[in-house]
Amino acid sequence: MAKSRVSVRTTHDSVASPIISPDSSSICVRARRAAICTALLLACLFAPAVADAEQQTFTMRYGPVSLGGYETAYPEPLVKTPKRSGYITKMSARIVDRHGRRMPLGDVMLHHVVFINSGHRGGVRKMSSCPGRPGEPFYGTGEETQTLLLPPGYGYRVDRRDRWRMIAMLMSHKLEQTKAWIEYRITIETSRKLTPVRPLWLRANGCDPTSSYTVPGGGAPGSDDVRSSDWAMPISGRIVAAGAHMHGSAKRLTITQPRCGGRTLIDHRPRWGASNDAVYKVRPLLHEPGPIAAGYFLSRKGIPVRRGEPLNVTGVYDAQLAHPAVMSITHIYVARDDKASMACDPLPADRRIDWSRKLGRNSVAPMQLPLTGLDDRGRPRQIASAQGPSVVAGASVTVDLERSLFSPPNLSIALGGVVTWRSLDQERHVVILANGPRAVDSPLMRQGATHAQRFDVAGTYNLFCYLHPVTMHQTLTVRPE
């Protein structure tokens, strides 16, 4: 059973304090004399209250998450909280090993993680930005490795009785079974009142059942797939921070204000790794490499918004190639202010964009994935098509997903034909496009589930299950009329 581990660090705005944790004895090792060591510990334990702001930093871990060779895991557990009342001013997450050391992308990738506050009994009910969905997402990141940052004087209010859950996606790039831990670090202001912020998760695809959507492909070179959704603001206030999550082939993610002529309030631009970045070297490629950073908006003054007014969230992706399961999500933090201006004043002069990675490229060529199999020594290798017998079918056919294999692995159907994939395994599967003329993207399929799709564009579709990416392939040929 996965467990959590906690360490705590306390600091004041005026002076730095030593770490108060099970290894506080390291202070003694560095002290030259026992008397100095004793004085330091007594000062930490019995120091009088101070007027300066006090912050505590908690380092917590969830795990282990066990991953088989090249597998993808989707943990959705309840997780430990700091059990402190106060205001979160900073939070980050990463993948570490059992010793707390960062794991390289070549071993395990944190594709995304979201922390959701379910509140506590008798407290204010926490809800998402979509009606009927319990819990308040308050921090998330993906390959962008974004940190929750807020301007000075602001914080996300938490109660020591709150319950948190986590939704994460981890991808293994190792043949051997491995274990990983999700480490999350939280800084909480505990001694003074800050201006509270409300987190809002806004998506370009609105309140669809899933947070991802599909770019079908087939557009002209350089063309854009544009998805847009309006979100009514639940409170009046000021946007003081905003992060973003996008996938491979994203071009931008914007928030615009229709009542002020559709002006752009926030423009989240993706930043891509250099051609030799580790994100492009991992094998097998389980998904199209995403941006290594996205522009993170900050402003102490904030952008005024009024309750009920719509803000438009627009995600733009390459439309030439098919891109299944993309995301366009912005996380905005709004400080309540019932007197927020209705005027379309200039945007705050103190606004700035923070980058988790300073260096990178502003754009990359869109791409699709190769199929990846294993050689005789268990090493990943690129393959041109699925291995195994072929079946020629007519207008409709059912493909079984059984023993973590497609049956049949090679299939030919007539133009306009319908393929129905049927999962017979207890393990979950997904059918997704690696490369081909149009997108294929099934939901996660449990035993007995089916997914059907009609094919109106001729060509070769290489498909795989990214939960079992090196063993579970299908090559589908759609014959022209």
Regions found by a protein language model. Name each.
Residues 35-46:
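Bacterial N-terminal signal peptides
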Residues 54-238, 243-378:
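Beta-strand-centric surfaces of beta-sandwich/beta-rich domains
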